[in-house]
UniProtKB/Swiss-Prot annotation:
GO molecular function, one term: 4 iron, 4 sulfur cluster binding
Coiled coil: none
Binding site for iron-sulfur cluster: 56, 61, 64, 70
Name recorded for this polypeptide: Probable [Fe-S]-dependent transcriptional repressor FeoC
Native source species: Escherichia coli (strain K12)
Keywords: DNA-binding, Iron, Iron-sulfur, Metal-binding, Repressor, Transcription, Transcription regulation
Entry-linked InterPro entries: FeoC, Tscrpt_reg_HTH_FeoC, WH-like_DNA-bd_sf, WH_DNA-bd_sf
Family in the record: Belongs to the FeoC family.
A family per Pfam: FeoC
Induction text: Up-regulated by S-nitrosoglutathione under anaerobic conditions. Repressed by the global regulator Fur.
Gene Ontology biological-process annotations: iron import into cell
């Protein structure tokens, strides 16, 4: 089980990562990683970076059956 400090340190080493990548790297369940990232965000230590829909090549993200699954969410330290 990873700690909040390990999540912070991993973000410091890698720059920015997705929650799934952090979960896999630290061998910790993703819901736990999501909670830790939200805690870091509320403490002002981490920031959530969401891709803009402008990057969609087909321009049809709004009507995508996967519900914007192509838009990735990254985390980085402030």
């Amino acid at each position: 089980m990873a700690s909040l400090i390990q999540v912070r340190d991993l973000l410091a080493l890698r720059g920015r990562m997705e929650a799934a990548q952090i979960s896999q790297t630290l061998n910790t369940p993703q819901p736990m990683i999501n909670a830790m990232l939200q805690q870091l965000e509320s403490m002002g230590k981490a920031v959530r970076i969401q891709e803009e829909p402008d990057g969609c090549l087909s321009g049809s993200c709004k009507s995508c059956p996967e519900g914007k699954a192509c838009l990735r969410e990254w985390w980085a330290l402030r």
